Swiss-Prot record:
Name of the protein in its database record: Photosystem II reaction center protein K
Membrane topology: Single-pass membrane protein
Gene: psbK
Keywords from the UniProt entry: Chloroplast, Membrane, Photosynthesis, Photosystem II, Plastid, Reaction center, Thylakoid, Transmembrane, Transmembrane helix
Quaternary organization: PSII is composed of 1 copy each of membrane proteins PsbA, PsbB, PsbC, PsbD, PsbE, PsbF, PsbH, PsbI, PsbJ, PsbK, PsbL, PsbM, PsbT, PsbX, PsbY, PsbZ, Psb30/Ycf12, at least 3 peripheral proteins of the oxygen-evolving complex and a large number of cofactors. It forms dimeric complexes.
Family: Belongs to the PsbK family.
Chief subcellular location: plastid
Matching InterPro entries: PSII_PsbK, PSII_PsbK_sf
Length: 45
């Protein structure tokens, strides 16, 4: 019974993290750009 209440409350608890979840898929693109800028800085050795 208590677990059912906790599971029901979970979506409300995760509303705080929705902006973070929206940003997460963009992070690999930033790593790709960082690698490109780093290679450009050292002259594509």
């Amino acid at each position: 019974m208590i677990t059912a209440i906790i599971i029901a409350k979970l979506p409300e608890a995760y509303t705080v993290f929705r902006p973070l979840v929206d940003i997460l898929p963009v992070i690999p693109i930033f790593f790709l750009l960082l690698a490109f800028v780093w290679q450009a800085a050292i002259g594509f050795r």
